[in-house]
Amino acid sequence: MSQMELIKKLREATGAGMMDVKRALEDAGWDEEKAVQLLRERGAMKAAKKADREAREGIIGHYIHHNQRVGVLVELNCETDFVARNELFQNLAKDLAMHIAMMNPRYVSAEEIPAEELEKERQIYIQAALNEGKPQQIAEKIAEGRLKKYLEEVVLLEQPFVKDDKVKVKELIQQAIAKIGENIVVRRFCRFELGA
C-alpha cells in the first residue's frame, strides 16, 4: 500500500485531518497500528484542552428499543448550535442513547457516585477477599481492581462502548471532540424500562 493510500485509509478510519494523519504515520514509522494509537492519544490531548470550555448548546438524543419496552433520553451538550446540527454530533447522541438503553449505567461520571457508596463497595470487596484468606494488603489491592470493574458497570463514561468494546465511551467522546473541534459533554440521561 502506498503512503497516500495509507493516509487516506487512516483518515477515513479516524476522521483526523490529513496532516495529522501524515504526522502520526511519520512518527510511527508508517506503522498503521502505532499511528492510530498516536492519533487517539493526540485526540485525547486535544479533548483535554477543550474540556474546560463551556458547552451550553446541544441536543436531546433519544432511543426507543424495537420492542418498545426500553427508552432513553440523553442531553448532549456542545459549544455552538452549528455543531448541534452536525450529523456526527447527532449520531453520537443517538449512539449514546442506544448504549445507555443496552448497558444501563447509573451515573454519567465517577464523580457523581456518592463517596459512601464507593466506600461501601470497597469494604464489601475487601471483606470478601479477607474471607478467602487473603492478607489485608492483598485484599485492598483486590478491592481496588474490583472497584474499577464496578465503575465500568455503573458509570457511562467508563463503560466499553456497545458498538466497539475496545473503546470506552469517554474515548468515543474524545474522538468526537477531536473531529469536531469543540467540547462535548454528556450532561445527563434518563432511562425508562417498562415494569422496572
Swiss-Prot record:
Name of protein: Elongation factor Ts
Organism from which the protein derives: Thermus thermophilus (strain ATCC 27634 / DSM 579 / HB8)
Subunit and partners: Heterotetramer composed of two EF-Ts.EF-Tu dimer complexes.
Main localization (coarse): cytoplasm
UniProt key word Transport: no
Keyword Cytoplasm attached: yes
Lineage: Bacteria, Thermotogati, Deinococcota, Deinococci, Thermales
Localization, UniProt: Cytoplasm
Family annotation (Pfam families): EF_TS
GO CC list: cytoplasm
Top-level taxonomic group: Bacteria
Chain segments carrying region Involved in Mg(2+) ion dislocation from EF-Tu: 80-83
Annotated PANTHER family: ELONGATION FACTOR TS (PTHR11741), ELONGATION FACTOR TS, MITOCHONDRIAL (PTHR11741:SF0)
Record-stated family: Belongs to the EF-Ts family.
Function: Associates with the EF-Tu.GDP complex and induces the exchange of GDP to GTP. It remains bound to the aminoacyl-tRNA.EF-Tu.GTP complex up to the GTP hydrolysis stage on the ribosome.
SUPFAM superfamilies xrefs: Elongation factor Ts (EF-Ts), dimerisation domain, UBA-like
Keywords linked to the UniProt accession: Cytoplasm, Elongation factor, Protein biosynthesis
Molecular function GO labels: translation elongation factor activity
Gene3D superfamilies cross-referenced by the UniProt entry: 1.10.286.20, DNA helicase RuvA subunit, C-terminal domain (1.10.8.10), Elongation factor Ts, dimerisation domain (3.30.479.20)
